[in-house]
Amino acid sequence: MPLVNTIHHSAFIYNQLKKLNLCKFYPNRVINHLISILISIFISGYHGKTTDFAKNSSCHRTTIAHFLNSGKWDDSLLSDTLKRSVIEIIYSEAARTGKPVFCIVDDTIASKTKPSSRALHPIEDAYFHQSHLKGKQDYGHQAVAVMLSCNGIVLNYAFVMYNKSISKIDIVENIAKELPVPPVMSYFLCDCWYTSEKIINTFAGRGFHTIGALKTNRMLYPFGFKKKLNEFAALLSTTRSHFHLVTVKKQKYYVYRYEGNLNGIENAVVLLSYPEKAFGNPKALQAFLSTDVSLSVDETLSYYAGRWILFF
């Protein structure tokens, strides 16, 4: 990055940190390290290594590594300040426009090379995790990311490393508990990992309905009879007459709307969905839950599709 651009971006970042009053709480050495790290993250060629940070700092990379690993500064102050700022921006936009707040949750794995069994210094907090993208165990760091969104504004609220000391369900539940009640009807968007009774109820207590993917072996109770979701879909898909063709982001899907009980959920909507060209294919079946039964099929799928404005 040219020097003039570095100076420009440094001044901009410094002013933003100043607006958050962080310059009052952190000494200059901490602010300078943060500015160097932030500039490095947003320039081309960033690889997530301390050597990248050193390129935009007057300090050696070992000094920056020491700051990150052992530096005497309260990183929770930075995290809490950023969270308050994100809440203020997103909730103010919701109050101004009447548009819903979306709390979007997902997790990802930063893959690392598996260390030798004789390695003296294996990568800290790296474990084997089940990768849904690769369909197998993957070695690396896993993190849970939480975004808040309203009216096209999308901001990172939290990024929590998962080190198996606390479950991902508990991580998300703790985040739900700390969120203020939004000024309008709002929604928690997630994949099937997080559509648990525990999380749904916690978000409901904070003013958020849940819209999320469901595993196809979840139990439904159509017409009062207990039936696995995929078995119920197989019965319905003998004919297209039970389904409605809808369009989401220029893609067409056959969708059946179920409203009723699930285990642990008294009343919700479940959408059974097949791509137009894969109708009746069990491997193409997808299911989505909405605890807001007032939403139309199109609204539910449109809201859920909004989670893919995401970050990975």
Task: Name each model feature, range by range.
Residues 38, 50, 61, 99-104, ...:
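A common structural microfeature
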Residues 36-51, 84-91, 128-136, 230-234:
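Short N-terminal helix-initiation segments at or just after the protein's N-terminus
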